Amino acid sequence: MAKEDCIEMQGTILETLPNTMFRVELENGHVVTAHISGKMRKNYIRILTGDKVTIEMTPYDLNKGRIIFRSR
């Protein structure tokens, strides 16, 4: 996925799913399923319910995304 094709959005973690998947509610009200990016997994970044995150999505499938940043 090319970087310029991605859509970045802010959201909140609603629930944790198996295999490091999360249900995220975006600021516009949509709920998507997202997984952790490889660098976050490599550096053992913990994500809990209620955390504010930045996700990137492809314009081809707006129901799935990748968590790329966890806000403090």
Curated annotation (Swiss-Prot):
Signal peptide: none annotated. PROSITE patterns: S1_IF1_TYPE. It comes from the Bacteria. Keywords: Cytoplasm, Initiation factor, Protein biosynthesis, RNA-binding, rRNA-binding. GO terms for cellular component: cytosol. One of the essential components for the initiation of protein synthesis. Stabilizes the binding of IF-2 and IF-3 on the 30S subunit to which N-formylmethionyl-tRNA(fMet) subsequently binds. Helps modulate mRNA selection, yielding the 30S pre-initiation complex (PIC). Upon addition of the 50S ribosomal subunit IF-1, IF-2 and IF-3 are released leaving the mature 70S translation initiation complex. NCBIfam families: infA. This is Translation initiation factor IF-1. It comes from Pasteurella multocida (strain Pm70). The gene is infA.
